[in-house]
Curated annotation (Swiss-Prot):
Membrane topology annotation: Single-pass membrane protein
Lineage: Bacteria, Pseudomonadati, Pseudomonadota, Alphaproteobacteria, Hyphomicrobiales
One Pfam family hit: KdpC
Protein name in the entry: Potassium-transporting ATPase KdpC subunit
Native organism: Bradyrhizobium sp. (strain ORS 278)
Transmembrane segments: 7-27
Region ranges (Disordered): 66-103
Function: Part of the high-affinity ATP-driven potassium transport (or Kdp) system, which catalyzes the hydrolysis of ATP coupled with the electrogenic transport of potassium into the cytoplasm. This subunit acts as a catalytic chaperone that increases the ATP-binding affinity of the ATP-hydrolyzing subunit KdpB by the formation of a transient KdpB/KdpC/ATP ternary complex.
First-listed, main subcellular location of the protein, grouped into a coarse class: membrane
UniProt-listed InterPro entries: KdpC
Name of the gene: kdpC
Amino acid sequence: MLKEIRPAIFVLLALTLITGLLYPLAMTGLAVTIFPAQAAGSLITRNGQVIGSALIGQEFKDDRYFHGRPSATSTADPNDSTKTVPAPYNAANSSGSNLGPTSKALADRVKEDVDKLKAENPAQPVPVDLVTTSASGLDPHVSPEAAMFQVPRVAKARGVPEDRVRALVVKNTEGRLIGLLGEPRVNVLALNLALDAATATK
């Protein structure tokens, strides 16, 4: 019987070694060698300090900054471990809201967001990604339209011409991958850092 089982045990051990150890180590080594920044998490630093990742969004509330998409991520309620409380862009708990299209809570939240944005820029239609969450809750990008929509607010809060802020949006707009894949997008953290740098001295 051992003779019949031995090949199966050998294959199990060999595949475990190859796919569980050698392959991951080889891929990690290649990634660190060829794409060191991406392998380290695409971290963004300022003055030598890590302030975020290009792959994970952050919540911005100040009018002087561009805002990202709504985030439905949550964290454990410190007062009741059986419940959760909202924690936007919580990278330790990536998730969507799980609210369906007939949900009153979802409809009320979207309406509230739309009303706030219309008050901010009544002349322009509200871009859909400014009122809808991503599946992960961590999307670091908004559409160019969503960024442009916020230009008047940001420019007013910083006391700079709108054209200057608009030019930064254009400069920080990423195109489709190899011209075909995905949609044009703007990384909110990168844009806000560029905004800080450009307006440090007006």
